[in-house]
């Protein structure tokens, strides 16, 4: 069994609630296995909230809007470069380490390569985030990720309208025991 959060939008801070759903984990790396997990989480959520319309936000989503809103596909405009880049790249390139290193070249690789870049693991302690000349503290933990994600949605009017059709957000790959930020939380906000 596994547990994953569903983020539900609300009108007061922190602007979301979390419902943890326990489900039978379908192991494996195949997309079909990941989609079985998505379905299991959503089915469990609908048992609690029968009127719910949840959306998986990931490249494995069963709904195209969820794929478009994934950090690998949702684009964020970077004023200095006069170009848009995937959220994943902006997030990884925004990390600033204790020696002052910031790997802005991660904007120019695939989102998968940006996420897996070895330098991110070997550069010491993360001290802050930096984007467009603005520094972001590490606490609250998801501040920077939420900032770039929400602004990217605002920049995309079509997706900003589509996201309103849903009232619960998941990111099945996100494990709160191992990670801090999730696109599901950002979408709920």
Residues covered by each model-derived region:
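Sequence-level detector for tyrosine residue identity
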Residues: 7, 16, 49, 77, ...
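Generic hydrophobic-segment detector
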Residues: 17-18, 123, 176
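Aromatic- and glycine-enriched beta-alpha-beta binding-site module
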Residues: 57-119
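Short, extreme N-terminal leader segments that mark the start of a protein/domain
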Residues: 1-54, 59
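Active-site nucleophilic cysteine motif
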Residues: 176-189
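Long, contiguous internal "core" modules enriched in hydrophobic/ aromatic residues
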Residues: 108, 120-171, 187
